[in-house]
Amino acid sequence: MHALRPIFFGVIAMAIVVAVSNVAVGYPINDWITWGALTYPVAFLVTDVMNRSFGASNARKVVYGGFLVGVIFSIWLADIRIALASGTAFLTAQLIDIFVFNKVSQKTWWQAPFISSSLSSAIDTVLFFSIAFIGSELPWVTWAAGDYAIKLAMAMLLLVPFKLVISIITNQAAVVPRDTTP
């Protein structure tokens, strides 16, 4: 049961981030960004912490679990088109994040989370905004540009909590062994 605890908490964290972001994306701050741009990058933090601490296999479990729970709540809390766009973009981008993270994980501690989050955020942004808003009168292209700029800034800022959380997990006496399954 102890081995499932990180996955359980990862899934809960991911589901909360997805559901909150899917509601927040409907509330623009200005013509360039919505509130969702400030909350969603935390999903990449959750994925990267799980990947670094517990392995790619467990990170994927968190992504799949977070996807299922997040989509259910998103359908309930947000517009169906937002939920569909979110699910598609989330699943694609998070799995790419895990893949890229593992390819560059032997570099310095900050490169894997920054590079993987930057690339997968671009994919997430294009998929989400084109599915959610294409054909609407909303300024979704400028929202997408602003969203990606925020995601890049957040990828950099979230390196601090990434390092702190990894240090805490690494220093715990009862650490769950990292799954090295690709």
Q: Which residues are covered by each model-predicted region?
A:
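Hydrophobic transmembrane alpha-helices
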Residues: 1-54
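Membrane-interface helix-boundary motifs at transmembrane edges
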Residues: 2-3, 51-59, 103-108
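Cytoplasmic-side transmembrane-helix entry/capping segments in multi-pass membrane proteins
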Residues: 6-11, 57-68, 108-115
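Residue-level recognition of pore/gate-forming positions within transmembrane alpha-helices
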Residues: 15-18, 66-70, 121
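Structural signal for membrane-spanning alpha-helices in multi-pass inner-membrane proteins
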Residues: 18-26, 73-77, 128, 132, ...
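Interfacial aromatic-anchored transmembrane helix boundaries in multi-pass membrane proteins
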Residues: 23-35, 70-89
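A glycine-rich, hydrophobic loop/mini-helix early in the fold
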Residues: 47-77
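Membrane-embedded alpha-helical hairpins and interfacial helices in multi-pass inner-membrane proteins
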Residues: 83-182
